[in-house]
Amino acid sequence: MNDLEKICADAYEARVKIGTLDTDIKNKVLNDAADNLLKAEKEILEANKRDVATAEENMKAKSMIDRLSLDHDRLLGMADGLRQIAKLADPIGEVMSMAKRPNGLIIGKRRVAIGVVGIIFEARPNVTSDAFGLCFKTGNCVILKGGSDAINTNIAIVKALKKALTDNLVSDAALALIESTDRETTNAFMKMDQYVDVLIPRGGAGLIQNVVKNATIPVIQTGTGNCHVYVDKDADFDMAVNIINNAKTQRISVCNACESIVVHSAIAEEFLPKLYDKLREHHVQLHCDERAQAILAGRDDVTEATADDWGMEYLDYIMSVKIVDSIDEAIEHINRYNTSHSEAIVTNDYDNAQKFLNEIDAACVYVNASTRFSDGNEFGFGAEIGISTQKLHARGPMGLEALTSYKYIIYGSGQIRE
């Protein structure tokens, strides 16, 4: 048995005990883990500095370095995230339904842990603590396979988290980090279906598609975010400008950032210059269709869009701009190019708002609000394991309940089937 298989086998062996831990023990571990992160701040931040320096030497994108970087405030946020998870109600053991059959059988549906969760992710150290917290609270063992860019940071974080397990006499097989960074190990991990119940990829389109195509373990896709804001002909201009500015520039490197603007032709000539002036404060580049380019002619950072722009998740200070002649055309365009993540309409027309809500195919659909709210904390779920863009098992921000399954519990008094 090689090192990878042993990690997976140990988690599989521990899954029953972890799945039946008392809530008080789980909460104690999570609070201790939060304390340990802060106690290990020096070691974690020094490890992170090494990873960031390597990324900068390798000329990695600014958006990637932003996701990778930790400081005191971000580490404090990770610790607070664990404490918030500890405060959430424990879903494990919840009786979801109970009914008595005519033959006297009492059949109940009880929420249980999934078992062993595998997570493959890129340069997001906060995923390490969030994933542990959510999986542990729901009685799951978790095996993490982070990207090479964050390896030193992840090792330091996992060391601090594991101490909370061992100090509370809980098997440290509840949390494992695959430290090998080679692609062969990742490919082998994706095929450990005899031990791992579900695999969740967190990262860019390339990573997610690689996992979906090659894994033999069931996959929950946490998709890329080609998110749109459609500005309807009856939109409030100031509201639309503020929403788009927030959705794009508050944090560019996240999957719920807006990447594309769709504008009704009836207002485009008046609205687009106002929007341009606001986005110009952040040096946002606009890749425009022919009509939008004509309206913004002569302005800096305005270029012609290519066919690739409409489906692009930039994660950068770049947006595509499309002008349409109707809400139907807007919906058709968005459904054709979106990634089923988060889409928004800005409008004062109730009927158009309802049409957009009903016909847009996405996990999160907004009326008059920023797509940046697609987040477990903002939805009141606590931390999230990711935002699912698929329709089976989980969709949208994945909180605690998304990391559970259920079993049927049947009480009898000697019944036999005739």
From Swiss-Prot:
It comes from Agathobacter rectalis (strain ATCC 33656 / DSM 3377 / JCM 17463 / KCTC 5835 / VPI 0990) (Eubacterium rectale). InterPro entries: Ald_DH/histidinol_DH, Ald_DH_C, Ald_DH_N, Aldehyde_DH_dom, G-glutamylP_reductase_CS, Glu-5-SA_DH, GPR_dom. It is an enzyme of class 1 (oxidoreductase). Its main location: cytoplasm. It comes from the Bacteria. PANTHER family: DELTA-1-PYRROLINE-5-CARBOXYLATE SYNTHASE (PTHR11063:SF8), GLUTAMATE SEMIALDEHYDE DEHYDROGENASE (PTHR11063). GO terms for cellular component: cytoplasm. This is Gamma-glutamyl phosphate reductase. The gene is proA. It catalyses: L-glutamate 5-semialdehyde + phosphate + NADP(+) = L-glutamyl 5-phosphate + NADPH + H(+). Catalyzes the NADPH-dependent reduction of L-glutamate 5-phosphate into L-glutamate 5-semialdehyde and phosphate. The product spontaneously undergoes cyclization to form 1-pyrroline-5-carboxylate. It holds the Pfam family Aldedh.
